[in-house]
């Protein structure tokens, strides 16, 4: 999704010479991570069920987030849930979730429903602004996909998802129920359980964008990649992911002695930097909030050169810092155009304060 942008019309109560007509933003992605949990007549809802225990943690060393909980449904059914979630650093187009449910006192059917959800709600200034169109969604017996397109810039992204399902650590091959709606696609798969039994679903999602692939090939490419990584399997993929993070920490870790809070803080900053920017594409950059939320639209500010380049310059191969600077250099023609709008000439360059594509996206310059 990095590098995919959307042009949002500038809205101000006054207008000055040089104001940009559009504000670029990185659009919020479709929800590839959704997995619903259903019993015979109930569906997991943490707002309506009793949460007997809950723990969520992030292992920054290995790049894995965990969530553990014990819950009781309104009908008294008790479950223990364990979730592992990664965005793969060794295969950056791949996202994985392992979702495990154990019955404490429940007898009946447990269904897990992995979904690709295109019902996107933005948290930014205009939550009702429609950014994505659904070009096509569909499924086969083993894979589902959601093909999307931004409304103005015609950038496209395709998500493809497949899964493995286990009961008591043994893979099952029961035929799933296909879910095909206008903006959702996926499967429902389940098993009958008694107290002490457990079921596990591993969800493999591959994401392909028009930044790297021909639009006509996005569905084929993402589906093929999802099926390929399923054949490789969770254990191998997660070991690749762990090794990738180990190489990052061996290269960039900062050790602070005697201050555990500062130590955790600096490592969290490093973790978020690498979650946002890998350094292998000079068309990409780092927004002030990384990919932690929608603030600032994911745009690049001057903070990159001030705050991020020094870190990468001192701790990583020179190509990474070089690519960050190449990002600016490649936008020189737009910087000259920006200066011309304000009356400058003879090749004067005004690099933008806020941008994704080289055009100034901020209405007031600092």
Listing of model-derived features with the role each one plays in the protein:
Residues 1-296:
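Acidic/polar, glycine-enriched structural segments that form the non-catalytic walls/loops
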Residues 235-366:
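Substrate-binding groove/exosite segments of carbohydrate-active enzymes
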């Amino acid at each position: 999704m990095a590098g995919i942008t959307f042009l949002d019309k500038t809205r101000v109560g006054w207008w000055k010479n040089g104001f940009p007509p559009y504000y670029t933003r990185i659009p919020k992605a479709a929800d590839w991570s959704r997995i619903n949990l259903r019993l015979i007549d109930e569906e997991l809802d943490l707002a309506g069920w009793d949460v007997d225990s809950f723990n969520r943690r992030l292992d920054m060393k290995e790049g894995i987030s965990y969530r553990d909980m014990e819950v009781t449904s309104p009908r008294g059914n008790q479950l223990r849930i364990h979730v592992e979630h990664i965005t793969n650093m060794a295969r950056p187009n791949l996202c994985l979730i392992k979702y495990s449910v154990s019955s404490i006192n429940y007898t009946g059917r447990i269904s897990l429903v992995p979904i690709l959800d295109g019902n996107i709600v933005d948290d930014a200034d205009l939550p009702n602004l429609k950014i994505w169109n659904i070009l096509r969604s569909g499924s086969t017996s083993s894979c589902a996909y959601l093909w999307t397109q931004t409304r103005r810039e015609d950038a496209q992204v395709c998500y493809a998802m497949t899964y493995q399902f286990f009961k008591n650590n043994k893979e099952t091959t029961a035929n799933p129920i296909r879910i095909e709606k206008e903006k959702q696609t996926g499967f429902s798969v389940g098993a009958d359980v008694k107290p002490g039994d457990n079921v596990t679903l591993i969800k493999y999602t591959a994401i392909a964008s028009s930044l790297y692939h021909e639009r006509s090939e996005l569905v084929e490419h993402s589906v093929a990649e999802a099926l390929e990584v399923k054949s490789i399997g969770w254990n191998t993929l997660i070991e690749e992911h762990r090794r990738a993070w180990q190489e990052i920490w061996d290269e960039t870790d900062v050790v602070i002695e005697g201050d555990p809070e500062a130590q955790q803080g600096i490592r969290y900053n490093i973790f978020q930097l690498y979650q946002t920017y890998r350094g292998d594409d000079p068309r990409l950059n780092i927004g002030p909030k990384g990919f932690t939320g929608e603030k600032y639209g994911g745009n690049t500010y001057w903070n990159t050169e001030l705050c991020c380049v020094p870190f990468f310059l001192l701790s990583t191969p020179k190509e990474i810092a070089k690519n960050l600077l190449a990002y600016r250099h490649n936008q020189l023609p737009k910087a000259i155009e920006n200066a011309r709008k304000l009356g400058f000439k003879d090749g004067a360059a005004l690099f933008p304060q806020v941008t994704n594509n080289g055009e100034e996206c901020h209405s007031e310059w600092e």
